[in-house]
Amino acid sequence: MARDYYGLLGVSRNASDADIKRAYRKLARELHPDINPDEAAQAKFKEISMAYEVLSDPEKRRIVDLGGDPMENAAASPSGFGGFGGLGDVFEAFFGGSSASRGPIGRVRPGSDSLLPMWLDLEECATGVTKQVTVDTAVLCDRCQGKGTNGDSAPIPCDTCGGRGEVQTVQRSLLGQMVTARPCPTCRGVGVVIPDPCCQCVGDGRVRARREITVKIPSGVGDGMRVRLAAQGEVGPGGGPAGDLYVEVHEQAHDIFVRDGDDLHCTVSVPMVDAALGTTITVDAILDGMSEIDISPGTQPGSVIELRGQGMPHLRSNTRGNLHVHVEVMVPTRLDQHDTELLRELKRRRSRDVAEVRSTHAAGGGLFSRLRETFTNR
């Protein structure tokens, strides 16, 4: 059964174009989503918008007057090409429009997310930190409280698009006429205009301002990680809900420690004599203060001592990484006569030990000699 488009607008079948437009504008002022957020009103607004679209088009109105419904075919084939499936999408991509009506985007929309870089040193990443930062962002207009209007004035449906937020154009192609829908240039797709806008925000419902935000960084964060602060981003147009603020951590290089995930690496220099005889040194760990490390006798250059659980805290648990201490053996560059004599004596003693080992192997008493005799019967 065909819809009663005249009844939806409350006009007679003999109504003029001006009468139809006047009736639609009166109903749109009451039912537009930006004016009346009730769900029933929104459904009614869609119906009267469809009725106005039909009756304001001479060809579609002629079909109605003959007892037909021009929107039934449109519902069966929203792309305008019936059984040709996605052919309408091809023409949409080619011509930059669409024959399907999308409706107004709404004046009140969510705000954008914001990204704030923050530089932290290794200690702050390890312990966590709370900082006050200043951001330049979009905030709610305090004069109109986001309405965008001046005083008691209110938005009204756009005359250009009739509150639909889009205008339709007819293009001729080799396959015939194509009806494409584009955002209305007057209301920019919103569907309403503000005749008396707020003098502070000029109808946008928000203004640019600098504001202080408290940022709490948890312990264990690392370079490139982002901390999300819900609803701390930009306020949306028309006083819409604010987006989120993302704080991106940039970790500064440390003078002593190199970070590898939750593990830390550092290098300590140990005198040659201490490496040979053994000693105890102290390392200033990030969270544990001064830690004592035992250097075993005979420690070689490049040795790594692992201190478990003394690295960085894990972001989402109570565990910690390890501290890896790389030993660098320092060889003295300046020796007095006494030091030189001591080292030469040590060299002679070590040389005798090496000679004794070699003579043992030459006499056949070595391990490899015995193995050779076993497998070769020599």
From Swiss-Prot:
InterPro entries: DnaJ (IPR012724), DnaJ_C (IPR002939), DnaJ_domain (IPR001623), HSP40/DnaJ_pept-bd (IPR008971), HSP_DnaJ_Cys-rich_dom (IPR001305), HSP_DnaJ_Cys-rich_dom_sf (IPR036410), J_dom_sf (IPR036869). Zn(2+) 1 binds at C141, C144, C198, C201. NCBIfam families: PRK10767.1, PRK14278.1. Keywords: Chaperone, Cytoplasm, DNA replication, Metal-binding, Repeat, Stress response, Zinc, Zinc-finger. Zn(2+) 2 binds at C158, C161, C184, C187. Binds 2 Zn(2+) ions per monomer. This is Chaperone protein DnaJ 2. One of its GO terms (biological process) is chaperone cofactor-dependent protein refolding. It holds the Pfam family DnaJ_C. Residues 4-68 form the J domain. The J domain is necessary and sufficient to stimulate DnaK ATPase activity. Zinc center 1 plays an important role in the autonomous, DnaK-independent chaperone activity of DnaJ. Zinc center 2 is essential for interaction with DnaK and for DnaJ activity. A zinc finger (CR-type) spans 128-210. One of its GO terms (cellular component) is cytoplasm. Coiled coil: none annotated. It comes from the Bacteria. Its cofactor is Zn(2+). GO terms for molecular function: ATP binding; heat shock protein binding; unfolded protein binding; zinc ion binding. The gene is dnaJ2. CXXCXGXG motif repeats lie at residues 141-148, 158-165, 184-191, 198-205. Belongs to the DnaJ family. Participates actively in the response to hyperosmotic and heat shock by preventing the aggregation of stress-denatured proteins and by disaggregating proteins, also in an autonomous, DnaK-independent fashion. Unfolded proteins bind initially to DnaJ; upon interaction with the DnaJ-bound protein, DnaK hydrolyzes its bound ATP, resulting in the formation of a stable complex. GrpE releases ADP from DnaK; ATP binding to DnaK triggers the release of the substrate protein, thus completing the reaction cycle. It is found in: Cytoplasm. Homodimer. Its main location: cytoplasm.
